From Swiss-Prot:
InterPro entries: BRCT_dom (IPR001357), BRCT_dom_sf (IPR036420), DisA/LigA_HHH (IPR041663), DNA_ligase (IPR001679), DNA_ligase_AS (IPR018239), DNA_ligase_CS (IPR033136), DNAligase_adenylation (IPR013839), DNAligase_N (IPR013840). NAD(+) binds at D47, A48, E49, Y50, D51, S96, L97, E128, R151, E188, K306, K330. This is DNA ligase. The active site is at K130 (n6-amp-lysine intermediate). The gene is ligA.
Length: 714
């Protein structure tokens, strides 16, 4: 039985060792939320919770600056671009903004600017509503739109040029009299509230997924692979900034003057933007916009203040992930009181059990709210993400009168309970330890707040994502069987678990795949041939394909090399699963698994949870019955010049593909890493190597060309 996480200790009492562990936990959690927000357009926590996580991490790193790393979320922006779009390097990074949550913090921001610039008077400040949408960068050359990219991680975004050309607010040709030879113009893609409601109504009527809020709908609409879908969505754009400028279109440019030029160039600029000459003016604008917020046709989550003079901006510069010359003043969440009628459990595509409050309908900030996220078991019990008391430790029960808020216009959540209205018969909520969809047992890892269904191979709620993973490039990699086909076959009930893929041909007399639009006898024959070709598979690919939590490609290879053969692996996993008790696992098989270099307790526990679920074992047995052979692991050599060394490949390689280089290095006993650190022994740099090469040089890591690498391993 997994224990609930202990409350996080006060930062002032942390030792360096404990601070390192806590910082790592916070980084992983923040990175998960970044990925959900930036890559999948599906925020998993409120702005307030996210900000609390960031502030705790920032406080730890401030106390222990030696723990700060370049990859920390406090030093980076957003999340890496998704794989479905071409990558675009921003000529000037698209950084995020620091946040202020109180008037005093805005005053402190202005005072910092004055001290830095050694000014006696407050500099002019541009105040603008903070649009809750998707940041976009538009590159124009000689006035013509050449490329559009999302923010991504701030340095590399996604190329969405074709989709952006369908947005009426974005000119394909600049109209201003004076136009720079090259410029990157930036702003926010958003959707009007009324358009969002109409879109969700159409989605619901069509049986399609509805969006949580206008920001999600705008981001999801822009990041469509089918341009026609983007064109059908009512997307808008406000321009408010720029990146690279070959030259400015005026003498002595300022932020406010440049906004006027953007209007001349053909962009829509928010008419609410105001030039302020004092802190009081800026705060008055904040309060006025806050009062008008519900009546505005678009969602905003605060106000952005920017120093007006561009020469001041240049002198102020940046700190890691944000500019010194701008700050976002966030709004307090909007709240209302209602009754929580029921708590339901939803199972996500990755198996997470998420509690949802079903509420008596109530209007919050002009929007009718009927559901609110309860996040996890601890949140219901009255514990925050760090284990500290939340809502003064008051739990949430069915029948309670609760205060609901829309934090940052994202996902409604319950922030407090009106205890004097609690029904006498209201009982504490008991979080289910079984999946409500498939009945498999649920597990909660130590240090995490989420319960997850362990029926990875058989749970209908997870089926599509698990099957996509099963056929992915690093797993079974079946030619002609990708995400689109998996979704189609699953929707028709033909493929529910991995073994079903290998019985398609035997069932085709009844299924008749060749009758599906886009298929024919030749394509079906090729598909069956590709499936048959994967009836023989390498052990590490099979392990990776199972989709066990925390078992990526690297850990799958570690497991395969340790056990060597399928029989040895299965025997050890079943023995370890049989040794699982509520008190822990002291079996010899589990101890052996836990002691594998690079595996550790978290991964070992996840593997055992997988094999402790009988339905997973049954699904795996059904799969193995369809396979011809599982090839033993190729053991890494220990007698080479790179055995035990950590290697990073970067840039465009010409003598081999990245996968070939990685496989060859691993066969020779090297560990291939994805990022450069002090522990890196070699960086093999191809053409156009970027930040990894720079970091390697800064750290004094040995840098090799492809030829030098080949000479080393020959």
């Amino acid at each position: 039985m997994t224990k609930a996480p202990k409350p996080a200790p006060d930062i002032a009492t942390l030792t360096k060792a404990k601070a390192k562990v806590e910082a790592m936990r916070l980084r992983l959690e923040i990175e998960r939320h970044n990925s959900a927000y930036y890559q999948h357009d599906a925020p998993t926590v409120s702005d307030a919770e996210y900000d609390a996580l960031r502030r705790r991490l920032e406080a730890i790193e401030a106390k222990f600056p030696e723990l700060v790393s370049a990859s920390s979320p406090t030093q980076t922006v957003g999340a890496a671009p998704a794989r479905g779009f071409a990558k675009v390097q921003h000529a000037v990074p698209m950084l995020s903004l620091g946040n202020a949550f109180a008037d005093d913090e805005v005053t402190e921001f202005v005072e910092r600017v004055q001290r830095f610039l050694r000014l006696d008077a407050v500099p002019s400040i541009v105040a603008e509503p903070k649009i809750d949408g998707l940041s976009l960068s538009l590159r124009y050359e000689h006035g013509e739109l050449m490329r559009a990219a999302t923010r991504g991680d701030g340095f590399t975004g996604e190329d969405v040029t074709a989709n952006v050309r369908t947005i009426a607010d974005i000119p394909t040709t600049l109209k201003a009299k004076t136009i720079p030879a090259a410029c990157e113009l930036r702003g926010e893609v958003y959707m009007l509230k009324q358009d969002f409601l109409a879109l969700n109504k159409r989605q619901e009527e069509a049986g399609d997924t509805v969006f949580a809020n206008p920001r999600n709908s705008a981001a999801g609409s822009l990041r469509q692979k089918d341009v026609a879908i983007t064109a059908s969505r009512p997307l808008k754009f406000f321009a408010y900034a720029w990146g690279e400028m070959s030259d400015y279109p005026m003498d002595e440019p300022t932020q406010f003057k440049m906004l006027g030029w953007l209007k001349q160039a053909g962009f829509v600029v928010n008419p609410e933007i105001t030039l302020c000459t004092s802190v009081d003016d800026a705060l008055a604008f904040y309060r006025r916009i806050g009062e008008q917020r519900a009546a505005l046709p678009y969602d905003i989550d605060g106000v952005v203040y920017k120093v007006d003079r561009l020469d001041y901006q240049e002198r102020l510069g940046f700190v890691s992930r944000s500019p010194r010359w701008a700050i976002a003043h966030k709004f307090a969440a909007e709240q209302a009181t209602t009754v929580l009628e029921k708590i339901d459990i939803q199972v996500g595509r990755t198996g997470a059990l998420t509690p949802v409050a079903r509420l008596q309908p109530v209007t919050v900030g002009g929007v009718v709210v009927q559901n609110a996220t309860l996040h996890n078991e601890d949140y219901i019990k009255g514990l925050g993400n760090d284990g500290s008391p939340l809502r003064d430790g008051v739990d949430i029960r069915e029948g309670d009168t609760v205060v609901v808020q829309r934090a940052g216009d994202v996902i409604p959540q319950i922030v407090s309970v009106v205890l004097d209205k609690r029904p006498a018969d209201a009982t504490p909520y008991h979080f289910p330890h079984k999946c409500p969809v498939c009945g498999s047992h649920a597990a909660r890892e130590e240090g995490e707040a989420v319960w997850r269904c362990t029926g990875a191979l058989i749970c209908p709620a997870q089926a599509v994502e698990r099957l996509k993973h099963f056929v992915s490039r690093l797993a079974f990699d079946i030619d002609g069987l990708g995400e689109k086909q998996i979704v189609l076959f699953h929707e028709r009930g033909w493929v529910k678990e991995p073994a079903d893929i290998f019985t398609l041909q035997a069932r085709n007399a009844a299924l008749k795949l060749e009758d599906i639009e886009g298929y024919g006898e030749t394509s079906v024959r090729n598909l069956f041939a590709a499936i048959d070709a994967r009836r023989t598979i390498e052990l590490h690919r099979l392990i990776f394909a199972l989709g066990i939590r925390h078992v990526g490609e690297g850990n799958a290879k570690l497991l395969a090399r340790h056990y060597g053969t399928l029989d040895a692996f299965l025997a050890a996993m079943r023995a370890a699963a049989e040794g699982q008790t509520e008190e822990g696992n002291t079996s010899e098989a589990y101890q052996d698994l836990d002691n594998i270099a690079g595996i550790g307790e978290v991964v070992a526990a996840a593997v055992v949870e997988f094999f402790a679920e009988p339905r997973n074992v049954a699904a795996l047995d059904a799969l193995l019955a369809e396979l011809k052979d599982v090839l033993p692991a190729e053991q890494a050599r220990r007698d080479t010049a790179v055995a035990g060394k950590t290697v990073v490949f970067t840039g465009s390689l010409t003598k081999f593909t990245r996968d070939e280089a990685k496989a060859a290095a691993e066969r020779l006993g090297a560990k291939v890493a994805g990022s450069v650190s002090k522990k890196t022994d070699y960086v093999v740099a191809g053409a156009d190597a970027g930040s990894k090469l720079t970091k390697a040089k800064d750290l004094g890591v040995a840098v090799l060309t492809e030829d030098e690498w080949l000479a080393l391993i020959s």
